[in-house]
Curated annotation (Swiss-Prot):
UniProt similarity note: Belongs to the universal ribosomal protein uS4 family.
Name of this chain's protein: Small ribosomal subunit protein uS4
Composition-biased stretches (Acidic residues): 181-190
Keywords: Ribonucleoprotein, Ribosomal protein, RNA-binding, rRNA-binding
Biological process according to GO: ribosomal small subunit biogenesis; translation
Length: 190
């Protein structure tokens, strides 16, 4: 079993009632179909750690080996995840990142954007009910961060009724009724 990490995953805002912040958080929760504000704070903490690392590297000299090595590693990581564009591979652009850039790379958002779900909330339900796979692996975590090279492999799971697996409850019932020849067993789907 892996050792447990006791570091915090989200940073609670210092001031609980700031109208501007509350409005912006609520907008993000609604737009990206998040469960609660903690999911926003988790992304903001990740963003602040990345920006802090970039700020520290920018204080060093441009030819400093630490800045060159760690800066390139940070930028490469962000490009691979798809948060940073390949045309903007500089530390200055890392400082300009916003929470929306990270929220766009969540599996939930991408399932909706690819048209596999009717709404952002439907996307979350599909993921939690194990209907979505990335590559060959079923992923049931809506906050899963999808890499750029994995994005084209997002699809319905093979075991899912949506992906050609075992038919759902209503379809099985209709098939059984049609097989038996009973015309009175008519029921609406869903």
């Amino acid at each position: 079993m892996a050792p447990r990490s006791y570091s915090k995953t989200a940073k609670v805002p210092r001031r609980p009632f700031e109208a501007a912040r509350l409005d912006s958080e609520l907008k993000l929760v609604g737009e990206y179909g998040l469960r609660n504000k903690r999911e926003v704070w988790r992304v903001l903490l990740t963003l602040s750690k990345i920006r802090r690392a970039a700020r520290e590297l920018l204080t060093l000299d441009e030819k400093d080996p630490k800045r060159l090595f760690e800066g390139n590693a940070l930028i490469r990581r962000l490009v691979r995840v798809g948060v940073l564009d390949e045309s903007r591979m500089k530390l200055d652009y890392v400082l300009a990142l916003k929470a929306e850039d990270f929220l766009e790379r969540r599996l939930q958002t991408l399932v909706y954007k690819l048209g596999l779900a009717k709404s952002i909330h439907h996307a979350r339900v599909l993921i939690r009910q194990r209907h979505i796979r990335v590559g060959k692996q079923i992923v049931n975590v809506p906050s899963f961060v999808v890499r750029l090279d994995s994005q084209k492999h997002i699809d319905f799971a093979l075991t899912s009724p949506f992906g050609g697996g075992r038919p759902g409850r209503v379809r099985r019932k209709k098939a059984k009724a049609a097989e038996g020849g009973d015309g009175d067993a008519e029921e609406d789907e869903e």
